[in-house]
Regions:
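N-terminal signal peptide c-region/cleavage motif recognized by signal peptidases
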Residues: 22-23
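Hinge/cleft segment of the Venus flytrap/periplasmic-binding protein
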Residues: 29, 163-167, 179-180, 280, ...
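Flexible loop/hinge segments that line or gate small-molecule binding clefts
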Residues: 63, 98-137, 148, 155-161, ...
């Protein structure tokens, strides 16, 4: 019942084939990768794994320390201090909060250590490099998918991301660029919206439960900013017998999300080549360790929230819809296999059988 909308790439690409060589760094060098949390499995299972693997390939003598702050900004700051104390010469940070993480970049700069912002921008004049997809376009694609699979007068729910994550605001801005004209014209109805602190699915579940109660289950579409929120919304609708009848967007294309897509319960997810993002960050890390120029790895320069110019590598983004979208992700994401997706209920779907 859902149209197979969107198969195109949404953003400029990075030529990761060019990110494969670097002069050997010193054996005593160490790079620290600071993860934000473990609620979303991608950070440890995909991003960190790909970053470590790339570092082992291009700079096998460099030590990589991986930290996880479990969504606590003070913990992330302490972990950064610990990494610096242990001799880290480059910090690769996925900030919990784009503002408070500036302390990390500023402290590192005082010790002559550069900071790379991975996925989420760090609003500091000392942010050296940023790698990310076009999240505005990603949010717009999420909203467009839901619009294309609803009709005039239908009521929508928006489950937004974490208010402290700068990406969440950009994703939402992309969604609003599509939705606001329709809301203003009365062609769609904004039934309920809420932020999701820490991208916590439990909070998203409570929000969706509240939405269904307030709207008496009168919901025809869910614009969800990531797969965790999508899964929470689907679980809430499952209890009301609505799962599979309402288009639900997402982001990250986790294994669970792809299984839900094959079952027709989640209908879209935005996918980014996380292995390419990790490869870009690893290659820049080695360039920084060696004191080498890295301008050839960055295709753009952007300004962060404090007006500082930051070298930027935009990566591709893909709007995956239905079984075709699942097939594309499996084909292009080395961290996900068909066997991983074709488990449980999904194993009985036409895609897997």
């Amino acid at each position: 019942m859902f149209s197979q909308y969107k198969k195109g790439l949404l953003a400029g690409s990075v030529a990761v084939a060019a990110l494969t060589s670097a002069a050997p760094a010193m054996a005593a060098d160490m790079v620290a990768l600071l993860l934000p949390e473990n609620v979303n499995p991608r950070w440890e299972q995909q991003d960190a794994a790909a970053f470590v693997a790339t570092m082992q390939e291009i700079a096998p003598d460099v030590k990589v320390e991986v930290y996880n702050a479990n969504n606590d900004t003070s913990v992330q700051q302490r972990q950064a201090e610990q990494a610096l104390t242990q001799g880290a010469k480059v910090l690769v940070v996925i900030p919990i909060d784009g503002e408070s993480s500036a302390i990390i970049a500023d402290t590192a700069a005082e010790e002559g250590v550069p900071t790379i912002a991975y996925d989420r921008m760090i609003n500091s004049p000392n942010t050296k490099f940023w790698v990310q997809a076009d999240m505005f376009a990603t949010g717009a694609a999420q909203a467009q998918h839901v619009v294309d699979n609803t009709k005039p007068g239908d009521t929508l729910v928006l489950l937004k991301g974490s208010p402290t994550d700068p990406n969440a605001a950009v994703i939402h801005a992309g969604q609003v660029s599509v939705l606001q004209p329709l809301f203003d014209a009365g062609e769609r109805v904004m039934g309920y919206e809420n932020w999701t602190p820490g991208w916590d699915p439990a909070i998203a579940r409570r929000s969706m439960d509240q939405a269904l109660t307030q709207l008496n289950n009168n919901v025809q579409g869910v614009v969800s900013s990531n797969d965790g929120n999508a899964g929470a919304a689907i679980a809430a609708m499952e209890e009301q017998g609505m799962a599979g009848t309402v288009p639900v967007s997402g982001l990250d294309c986790t294994v669970q999300a792809q299984q839900l897509m094959l079952l027709g319960k989640q209908t879209q997810c935005g996918w980014r080549p996380l292995h390419e993002m990790a490869a870009a960050a690893a290659n820049v890390s080695v360039r920084l360790l060696n004191g080498d120029d890295y301008s050839d790895l960055a295709t753009e320069v952007v300004q962060n929230g404090v007006g500082a110019d930051v070298a930027f590598v935009p990566v591709d983004s893909y709007s995956a819809v239905g079984a075709e979208g699942v097939g594309y992700v499996i084909e292009n994401d080395p961290s996900i296999t068909r066997d991983m997706v074709c488990q449980g209920e999904a194993a009985a779907t036409g895609f897997c059988s």
